[in-house]
């Protein structure tokens, strides 16, 4: 499943079920108009929070990798709303 607007692109990757039976989902977020790596995130449905954000190892040390975290903090609420919508309509 894919969501795309003028600012970013969110792609559903997979669902994970951990040992506590919590449902969590892995998504990627690609912020447009900036040359930054794609941010991966894990969203916990039961807690309604993003529990983890990370960049693939191959991109960790490029000059703009730290910028993606700061930029994501500016759009995090909007991304969570879209993720909830995507999960509800799967």
Language-model features, listed with the residues they occupy:
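Amphipathic, interaction-prone secondary-structure segments
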Residues: 1-46
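Acidic, low-complexity intrinsically disordered segments
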Residues: 49-90
């Amino acid at each position: 499943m894919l969501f795309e607007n003028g600012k970013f692109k969110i792609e559903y990757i997979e669902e994970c079920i951990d040992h506590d039976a919590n449902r969590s989902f892995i998504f990627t977020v690609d912020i447009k108009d900036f040359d930054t790596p794609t941010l991966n995130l894990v969203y916990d449905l039961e807690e309604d929070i993003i529990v983890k954000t990370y960049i693939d190892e191959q991109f960790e040390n490029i000059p703009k990798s730290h910028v993606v975290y700061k930029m994501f903090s500016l759009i995090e609420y909007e991304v969570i709303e879209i993720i909830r919508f995507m999960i509800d309509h799967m």
